Amino acid sequence: MCHRSFTRIATALLAGLICMSAGLSQAADPWVEYQGTEGPGKGKHIVLISGDEEYRSEEALPMLGQILAIRHGFKCTVLFSIDPKDGTIDPKNQTNIPGIEKLAGADLMILALRFRELPDADMKHFDQYVNSGKPIIGLRTATHSFNYSRNKQSPFAKYSFNNGDWKGGFGRQVLGDTWINHHGHHGRESTRGVINPKNAKHPILTGVDDIWGPTDVYGVKNLLPSANVLVHGQVLAGMKPSDKPVEGKKNQPMMPLFWTREYTGTSGKTSRIVCTTMGASVDFESEGLRRAVVNASYWCTGLDKQISPTSSVDFIREYKPTFFGFGKFKRGVKPSDHAL
């Protein structure tokens, strides 16, 4: 064999080994990444953090990440609550979300947590992001993302949803309100999003004309005055979009459902904040809700003028979300199973 042929074969083998190594490394990552294609979001990085026991954020956030990356150009990294024993996604694990340090390079954080209590080393990265002036989108249970019941002496215990000193913790102080109650009858009364006519021309509502989801309306009774309500939540009498609104006090007045505000952290820099109390995996079957969250991602990252009413928010691959409920998550799923 000539030297030139041997070199070509050796180079090919080496390249193959490098690709295999990279593939194995990626498969072992406890998160999933979607590289942005061409689009307005190209060059910007969104970190989406899932971790709730009931509303299947571990299904919704990979779907959103795929849309934001493939349809709109953002690089998206999705983090999960992970069982450290086998590397599978375990929404019941409240203390382990690998990859939080990736927030250091993020341009936007999308959050769908519930009652987490992360180690201080991880919360340090979260805290730095919250105070950096960078934007945040909170979905559904993000208003009660944290519950410090084990380590109440942690410097980050103030993030707890029921904190008394930093009243209402992260939910109230950053997003605008903390968890109060189910305003609609959970599992029996669904939600119709009613656009606030005062804000009908807000960029986030571009192309949004219908929002409905099977989750109930949350009680939002102490929303900070600085919040700007874009959509109110109308309680429907049943679990179908055709059901009529409930009569009486539940809809008089309607609760805030989707709002924006600003938060100034310890850095002195101000963040754009978006929060909605919708956001279960089944809620995102609503094209209107998907569009509102995609538009919010543009708005949060300073791409307001790039928002289009005709941009695609179609699913990248078949989306059959699991209906909400405790203990209903799919066992044995690893982050790599969400890779494209």
Model feature map: region roles:
Residues 1-13:
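Bacterial N-terminal signal peptides that target proteins for export
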Residues 10-22:
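Bacterial N-terminal signal peptides
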Residues 23-27:
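Sec/Tat signal peptide C-region and signal peptidase I cleavage site
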Residues 28-41, 59-60, 67-71, 237-340:
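Extracellular ligand-binding/catalytic regions of CAZymes and related secreted enzymes
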Residues 29-35, 47-49, 53-146:
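Helical hinge/lid and interdomain linker segments adjacent to catalytic or ligand-binding clefts
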Residues 31, 69, 75, 94, ...:
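Catalytic beta-strand/loop cores that center a nucleophilic Ser/Cys/Thr
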Residues 44:
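Nucleotide donor/acceptor-binding cores
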Residues 111, 115-207:
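A glycine-rich, often tryptophan-bearing local segment used as a flexible ligand/cofactor-contacting loop or short
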